[in-house]
Structure formats: structure tokens, C-alpha cells
Amino acid sequence: MKDLQSVSVGIITREQSPEGAYVACPSFGPYRYCWLRDGSFIAYSMDRAGQFESAHRFHLWVHSVIQRHRTRIDTIVDLVGRGLEPDPQGMMPARYCLDGSISSDGWPVFQIDGYGTWLWSLASHVGLSGQTSLIAKTRGSIEKVVEYLSACWRMPSYDCWEEHGDLVHPSSLACVYGGLTAISQYVNNAEIPLLAAEI
């Protein structure tokens, strides 16, 4: 089992992008992206393996991606606040190019579970590594993701298999709830536990 772990850690480390993204599959075109959901679980597994620097780089990459596309969140939150329905293809995507850009290939982008999973993974990383300073560094992105989830959790979205985009999925809501609950331990924002309780 130790050999399997060391080989797995080696592959993940080798294929992690210079920016910190975890590629789903480097040799298959449709999967040469980083999914927040998958990447967050990979970061957690790297934390469990003691590879804190790798997980740290991933979380900083997610932070840079959220900051890069923060106006997209602002637009979505504004539309929802005015009772308007955002274009599903204009939502925050489930996956990103490794450089943090957004692909326009028509992939079903609207999946909220990845954003909740990231909050959980970030909180887990801080708890396991003791790198509490990461919360201050990523605070702006944490707040933006909470705004996004608060605006969108009731809306139909794709599930973790990227199917059934016309439904609201308990598995997605569980990821959002779990992420909000986990990150609320580190962020002093009374709205976060209230939102989790509402979900």
C-alpha cells in the first residue's frame, strides 16, 4: 500500500501545473482541465499524505482564479438579486483551464458542488497543516464564493456527473453545506452558518 501511495503522490506532484492546478488527465483533451471538485479532493489527499506544499499551491491557484473572475460573480449575484435568471453558460464553471481561464467549449458549467467542496478542502488543509495564514490570503475569494453560493444554491444545476441540469441535487447541497460549515470555523462571518442552516 505504501508503494501505491508513493507512486500516486509522485504522479500528482509531477502533473500539477506550475500555477498549482491539478489536471484531471494530461493525455486526454476533454480532461486537460482542473475541476474544483476533483482538485479539492486531490488537495485533501495530498494533505493526508503530508504533501502540504502541493495542497497549498492548489488553494492559492483557486484563489487566483476566483479573483480573476470575481466580476462574473458580481454580475450573477446582481441578476439573482433583481429576480432575473442568469444564463447557465454564464455561471461560474465547474472546471478551468490550467492557466485559470474559462473554456468556451459548451461543457455543462453550472455545478455548485465544486465551490462548496473547495471551501471544505481549504478548511481541512488549514486544520491539517496549521497554515492559518492562508485564510487571510484567500479571504476575498472565500467571501466571493459564499456570495455566489448564497445567490445560486436554490437554482437547478448539473450534478457531480454533469447530468440532470434541470434539478436541484441533494448531493450538491450537501457539498455546499459541508463547505460552509467547515470554513465557518476560520472565518468570522455570521451569515455563513445561517446560510448553512437554511440549506
Write out the residue ranges for each language-model feature.
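Acidic, mature catalytic/reactive cores of soluble proteins
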Residues: 1-199
